[in-house]
Regions:
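A short helix->beta-strand "capping" segment at the edge of beta-propeller domains
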Residues: 10-30
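A short beta-strand motif characteristic of beta-propeller blades
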Residues: 21-26, 60-65, 101-106, 143-150, ...
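Beta-strand-rich domains and repeat architectures in extracellular enzymes and scaffolds
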Residues: 25-49
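WD40/WD-repeat beta-propeller blade N-cap
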Residues: 25-32, 65-72, 106-113, 150-157, ...
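Conserved beta-strand element within WD40/beta-propeller blades
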Residues: 43-46, 83-87, 124-128, 168-172, ...
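Short coil/turn segments within WD40 beta-propeller repeats
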Residues: 49-52, 70-73, 89-93, 111-114, ...
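Short loop/turn segments that connect beta-strands within beta-propeller blades
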Residues: 56-59, 97-100, 138-141, 181-184, ...
Length: 305
């Protein structure tokens, strides 16, 4: 079911009973640690400290910049078309990709940036290994920014999920914290003693998917409290490091293993193993519809649909 590696491979478009099929496999020259879709035909890659653009149609990779001085851990596309990147050099950069220019370099964290998410009103929120989550606000006319600390935890903050009611969930060690962005106060928390939490992602129905260090996947229902709505059966054996939602509401997860898993929240007892990579999967991104991309330490980028 997977594509072979080491050369460019395209597969004919069998629907495979609705399960993802590898449509394209591209060999990479560098290890890629982060990935985001710019549009349905272009991906932005974080290849160590270099930002690159991959054109799916031409199957070509173009360097953008190596402004970061450390590995790029996270990339997101902002609603205004710009790109935000977080790095092991402790900085966040905002990019105009068309001009290949850095618009802002955000200084304030004292350790690795693990995650970035966009907020309403020209803001982003970051999660860092310095145990702090910061909110950053931009003044585009003055080309300035301000920031404040939302949470100062006792452990590193690895991930952020942004909810529709002006609230966020922070993943820190074995705890999940619910914060109100208006009051800047913690409203609730959930202790997950076994495995700890690495990644949280908001879903289109308002729930939140949680990936644990022991390979388990949870779905949370968010009220005034954080309530575990669904516990999926054991699929991964190692830390879940990425979660994406497809337009059909199914979830795809990757872990410190070489296989992906497709999950259906409506049928939590079922799972589908997606094989094709030969080494640990480092990053995963949604493209459009049921199309997504993955990158592995086997130095291949694969497009699935």
């Amino acid at each position: 079911m997977g594509c072979s590696t080491g050369r460019t491979v395209e597969r004919d478009k069998i629907n495979n009973n609705g399960y993802p099929v590898c449509r394209l496999s591209i060999p990479l020259q560098m290890e890629v640690g982060s990935l985001s879709a710019l549009d349905k035909n272009k991906l932005i890659l974080g290849a160590k400290e270099e930002l690159q653009c991959f054109d799916i149609l031409s199957k070509s990779i173009t360097p953008i910049s190596n402004e970061h001085k450390g590995r790029i851990n996270c990339i997101i596309k902002l609603s205004n078309g710009n790109i935000a990147t977080g790095s092991q050099d402790n900085t966040i950069k905002i990019w105009d990709i068309d001009k290949k220019e850095v618009l802002y370099t955000l200084n304030g964290h004292t350790s690795i940036i693990w995650d970035i998410r966009e907020l309403e009103g020209n803001k982003i929120i970051s999660a860092s290994d310095d145990n702090i989550s910061k909110v950053w606000e931009f003044n585009e006319k003055k080309k300035e920014y301000e920031s404040y600390d939302l949470c100062n935890s006792h452990r590193h903050i690895s991930s952020v999920a942004v909810l529709k009611n002006n609230k966020v969930i922070l993943a820190t060690g074995k705890n999940l914290f619910l914060y109100d962005l208006k009051t800047k106060k913690q409203e609730s928390f959930l202790d997950i003693p076994k495995g700890g939490v690495w990644v949280v992602r908001e879903l289109s129905n308002g729930d939140v998917a949680v990936g644990l260090g022991n390979g388990l996947l949870y779905i949370l229902k968010i009220t005034d409290e954080l309530i575990v709505k669904t516990k999926f059966p054991q699929g991964h054996k190692r830390t879940i490091n990425n979660i994406i939602e497809l337009d059909n509401h199914k979830l795809v997860t990757s872990s410190d293993e070489k296989d992906l898993i497709l999950w259906d929240p409506n049928e939590p007892e079922s799972m589908y193993l997606i094989k094709g990579h030969e080494d640990i999967i480092t990053c995963l991104c949604f493209i459009s519809g049921t199309k997504f991309a993955s990158v592995s330490r086997d130095k291949t980028l694969k497009i699935w649909e």
